[in-house]
């Protein structure tokens, strides 16, 4: 529904939309609930832009005391592979859920959120505006994982005036402060090595800047986290695991 978007927001979403996901909304058939992440990845690679069960029903009206829930995928994942189970569960419990595919690998329908996270934050903001307008609500709750639990929503909240539109932000194993990648950050970080500058250039060609941005010590992380990141008025819940082998150390 383009009428729910300002020309600016429509331009942002159109610029970042992926095959099968106009304005970020997966247009494929609803996929089955998957018992684990890798089966969901396989299914999304074999089917064009499947939608997780229950998601993106813009006729859904939140119950009293509830906000629409925007589910944010992780790096190089997609709406379905990230949320095939949780979207259905939240919908079954009466929540209105929304999720998206944006700013991914060129020409891919299922590898999203690989691009510059500063741009993805603008896309997230435009998507949230669309949700608020079409559900006639003032605020959303955010639930995300990995990039979608840390740097992306934090960039939106801190630099895109997102705090005025978010009530509760729940982050699952977020990549806050980046990852050392078991020491590779020392070689791949453009702020510390010439090799890192070449890595940035290579990732930019693939619309993959979210990878170097999520290295510990990156310019992106310094800008986002070197000053207070939490925003007044937003409730934060962070859930992490000592068994996380991607975001290392897990305390990041």
Describe the residue ranges of each PLM region.
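Serine-dependent carboxylesterase/thioesterase catalytic core
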Residues: 73, 120-224
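Extracellular/periplasmic catalytic domains that process cell-envelope and extracellular macromolecules
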Residues: 61-65, 90-92, 134-135, 143, ...
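Flexible, membrane-associating and regulatory peripheral segments of lipid-active enzymes
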Residues: 1-89
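Catalytic nucleophile-loop/oxyanion-hole region of alpha/beta-hydrolase
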Residues: 107-123
């Amino acid at each position: 529904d383009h009428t729910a978007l300002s020309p600016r927001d429509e331009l942002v979403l159109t610029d970042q939309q992926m095959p099968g996901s106009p304005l970020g909304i997966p247009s494929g058939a609803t996929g089955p609930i998957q018992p684990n992440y890798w089966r969901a990845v396989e299914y999304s690679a074999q089917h064009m832009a499947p939608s997780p069960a229950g998601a993106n029903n813009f006729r859904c009206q939140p119950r009293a005391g509830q906000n629409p829930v925007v589910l944010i995928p992780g790096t190089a994942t997609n709406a379905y592979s990230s949320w095939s189970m949780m979207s259905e569960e939240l919908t079954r419990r009466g929540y209105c859920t929304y999720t998206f595919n944006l700013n991914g690998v060129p020409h891919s329908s299922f590898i999203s959120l690989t691009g510059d996270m500063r741009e993805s934050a603008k896309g997230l903001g435009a998507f949230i505006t669309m949700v608020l307008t079409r559900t006639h609500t003032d605020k959303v709750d955010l639930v995300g994982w990995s990039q979608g639990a840390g740097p992306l929503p934090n960039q939106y909240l801190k630099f895109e005036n997102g705090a005025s539109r978010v009530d509760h932000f729940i982050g699952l194993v977020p990549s806050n402060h980046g990852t050392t990648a078991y020491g590779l950050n020392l070689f791949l970080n453009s702020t510390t090595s010439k090799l890192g500058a070449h890595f940035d250039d290579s990732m930019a060609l693939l619309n993959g800047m979210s990878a170097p941005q999520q290295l510990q010590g990156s310019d992106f992380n310094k800008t986002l986290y070197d000053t207070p990141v939490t925003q007044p008025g937003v409730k934060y819940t962070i859930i992490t695991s000592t068994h996380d082998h991607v975001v290392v150390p897990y305390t990041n």
